[in-house]
């Protein structure tokens, strides 16, 4: 027996925000090749298949629309404004991935183009992608801050190890000098 719900089911999509870790960060956008918002820019993304998770959907759509194959994405939020998609009730789950520098991409599938854009010079974005961008930048800033803290802590840890090693070497050298001095006195 098939169970049916008396409630309507919204569509579920996933979007993937890819930002570079550079002095002047860039974000990957696709130019939509079909309605709605044909010609506007958006994050790579699309509708979730029934046999995949939203994370798998984001990774698949990123590759389908840009040719970029990444597997390390982090969820930044779910977006469910009632009127966010003119096609009907749609909820999207957005993911973020940070890469070192832009990688060659091409618009594929229903994306007319795929390009890297400076965060300081964004084009008009489709749907509610400004909201997603705002959250992605917040998460990106936290990730960069955490990365810098980890690097600082690693450097501090390495510095402490080097100091300890240097101390041990000085002690060993002093010991060797004592041995040499004692040996010379005995002769």
Q: What function would you assign to each model-found segment?
A:
Residues 48-147:
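Unchanged
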Residues 154-176, 180:
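Short linear regulatory motifs and low-complexity interaction segments
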Residues 183-185:
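Long, low-complexity or tandemly repetitive, helically biased scaffold regions used
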Residues 142-159:
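Acidic/polar alpha-helix N-cap and adjacent early helical turns
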Residues 2-42, 55, 70:
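N-terminal strand-loop-strand
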């Amino acid at each position: 027996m098939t169970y049916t719900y008396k409630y309507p089911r919204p569509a579920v999509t996933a979007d993937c925000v890819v930002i570079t870790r550079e002095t002047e960060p860039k974000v990957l956008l696709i130019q939509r090749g079909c309605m709605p918002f044909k010609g506007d820019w958006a994050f790579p993304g699309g509708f979730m298949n029934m046999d995949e998770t939203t994370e798998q959907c984001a990774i698949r759509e990123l590759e389908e629309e840009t040719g970029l194959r990444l597997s390390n994405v982090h969820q930044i939020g779910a977006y469910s404004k009632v009127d966010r998609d003119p096609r009907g009730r749609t909820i999207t789950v957005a993911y973020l991935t940070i890469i070192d520098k832009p990688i060659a991409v091409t618009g594929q599938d229903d994306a007319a183009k795929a390009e890297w854009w400076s965060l300081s010079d964004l084009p008009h974005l489709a749907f509610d992608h400004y909201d997603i961008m705002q959250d992605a930048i917040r998460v990106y800033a936290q990730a960069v801050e955490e990365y810098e803290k980890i690097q600082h802590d690693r450097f501090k840890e390495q510095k402490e190890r080097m100091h300890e090693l240097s101390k041990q070497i000085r002690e060993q050298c002093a010991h060797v000098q004592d041995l040499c001095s004692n040996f010379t006195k005995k002769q």
